[in-house]
UniProtKB/Swiss-Prot annotation:
UniProt EC number: 3.1.26.4
This protein's record includes keyword Hydrolase: yes
Organism in which the protein naturally occurs: Mycobacteroides abscessus (strain ATCC 19977 / DSM 44196 / CCUG 20993 / CIP 104536 / JCM 13569 / NCTC 13031 / TMC 1543 / L948)
Cofactor notes: Manganese or magnesium. Binds 1 divalent metal ion per monomer in the absence of substrate. May bind a second metal ion after substrate binding.
Name of the gene encoding the protein in the UniProt record: rnhB
One GO CC term on file: cytoplasm
GO MF, one example: manganese ion binding
Protein name from the UniProt record: Ribonuclease HII
Length: 234
């Protein structure tokens, strides 16, 4: 029995990295945009979302493309300019930590994906997202489980989002020294936790995260009390 397109349920696996896009293109639903994020689980720094439409004839140029989480940092940095060069369109959106705090990580992720798709230079006919549905898109969309390892356009978006965010965190390390942002990129490592305990949260930390709130409470308890007027001799 043949599979109908577009599919109406979550896709869990594709036979090749370009299978979904090429099939959607063949039935007139292209161009296909992939969307992914970086920094969802971090307790500091922005949430970065990218949308990308790949050209159908760029398979050889982007042969090394894969799930960005499986690529080394050097490989991602090598792929980044190639994706920017060969993509039909791409757009990267950054949602700052204070906005993530205000509306929540999940809502920020959904809103960021909408903004990323809206910012594309070409209008997609279909959108593939990594793992969950994105309501409110102006075109049909479908979540793909493990999308950054199953669809080339999502894998490209994953690289764009991760490299863009990593660069932000390296720059942030200069503005907020002592936290090690350039190393752990804002995720809750042992080194980051110790820096939070010692320094307290910075303006780039997500105050809605439990470990950041705990660090803020701890640093305020350790802060010396201001002297009373009677103790100053005034």
């Amino acid at each position: 029995m043949s599979t109908s397109w577009p599919p109406r349920t979550v896709i869990r696996k594709a036979s090749g990295l370009r299978t979904l896009e090429l099939t959607l293109d063949r039935v007139g639903l292209g161009p296909v945009a992939g969307v992914d994020e970086a920094g969802r689980g971090a307790c500091a720094g922005p949430l970065v979302i990218a949308a990308c439409v790949l050209g159908s004839n760029q398979r050889k140029s982007l042969a090394a493309l894969n799930d960005s989480k499986k690529l080394t940092e050097k490989m991602r940095e090598t792929l980044f300019p190639l994706i920017c060069r060969y993509a039909e369109a791409y757009h990267v959106v950054s949602v700052p930590a204070d906005e993530v705090d205000r509306i929540g990580v999940h809502v920020a992720n959904i809103e960021g994906m909408r903004r990323a798709v809206a910012g594309l230079g070409v209008k997609p006919g279909y959108v593939l997202t990594d793992g969950f549905r994105v309501p409110g898109l102006p075109v049909p969309s479908l979540p793909v489980i493990g999308g950054d390892a199953s669809a080339a356009c999502i894998a490209a978006a994953s690289v764009l989002a991760k490299v863009s965010r990593d660069r932000v965190m390296v720059n942030m390390d200069s503005d907020h020294p002592g936290y090690g942002f350039a190393v752990h990129k804002g995720y809750s490592t042992a080194v980051h936790t110790e820096a939070l305990r010692r320094l307290g949260p910075s303006a780039q930390h997500r105050q809605s995260f439990v470990n950041v709130r705990n660090a803020a409470m701890g640093s305020s308890l350790m802060r010396p009390l201001a002297p009373r007027e009677s103790d100053t001799g005034g």
